[in-house]
Amino acid sequence: VRLLIALTLLIGSSTAFAATQCTTAERSTWQDPEAFQAQLKEQGYKINKFKVTKRNCYKTYGFDKDGRRVEIYHDPVTGKAVKTEYHD
């Protein structure tokens, strides 16, 4: 039983630290980064930093329309948020 619990915790912790993968699509199908950021700004986001991650995400750091500090991983093809982290 202890071994099963230990394995469960080990597997769970390794997936918790896995990097966020947003897409496997060819880069030619991705949205234009500048146009994508402009769309976010139109929705009320303030972008302090924007980057493309090693795991094929558009990652934004800044503030949402409610003024909360956020870090968001976006699928660069669809623009949908894959992961959102709020920071105090």
Located regions from the model:
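Short, low-complexity, Pro/Ser/Thr/Gly-rich segments in the mature regions of secreted, periplasmic
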Residues: 77-88
